[in-house]
Amino acid sequence: MAAASDTAVLDALVEIQRAQDPTLAFRYACRVGMCGSCAMVVNGRERRACRTRLESRGPGPVSVRPLYHFPLLGDLVVDMTLFAARLQDVGAALTPGENAEPYARVSGLSAERREIDLAIECIGCGMCVSASTMVGHNERFPGAAALNRTLTLGLDHRDGEREARWRVLLATTRLHAATGRATARRSAR
């Protein structure tokens, strides 16, 4: 399909679905890069289709495929059930401690916040799992998103499960199994 170079990959897919193939299946929700629903592999790199412009992919045709390491449901739609289960397996929800404040009161200027800041940008899109070679080698490896979430919660002073989270994070079958044997295939940015 011919499209302007500043067209987002997602917009091109919507147009293809509208004009050429109404059965084409893909996910999207927010269309502004916040939710990660439209994550897919574009010209061999994990991308959010709503934030990826056709022009940024260079001249010529653009190839799209579903994320790697996920069961395929149809066309560009993958099953995220195992991804969500891996987050649950590592305890990816805050468990308030006995003296935890009822509302998050972590100052944006505090050292704790600066330590956590980089890790809280994860939107749970699955691109890191797709880009990981370790996921393909060890089915017990929870993936970068789950490890990132565990780390973030392990650094939060309000969490009553901090010690347990660190044990999970450092468990031989989780993190140690991945170190030194595999790396991300490429950046998922």
PLM segments and residue spans:
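Short strand-turn-strand beta-turns centered on an Asx-Gly dipeptide
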Residues: 2, 41-45
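Ferredoxin-type iron-sulfur electron-transfer modules in oxidoreductases and energy-metabolism complexes
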Residues: 6-22, 64-189
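A cross-kingdom feature strongest in bacterial/archaeal respiratory oxidoreductases
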Residues: 25-27
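Short, structured protein-protein interaction patches enriched in aromatics and acidic/basic residues
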Residues: 30-37
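Structural beta-strand/beta-sheet cores of well-ordered domains, especially the beta-sheet scaffolds
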Residues: 36, 60-62, 118
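Extracellular/mature segments of secreted proteins
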Residues: 38, 58-59, 186-188
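Short beta-strand scaffold segments in enzyme catalytic cores
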Residues: 39-40, 132
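Glycine-rich phosphate/adenylate-binding loop and adjacent beta-alpha elements
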Residues: 45-64
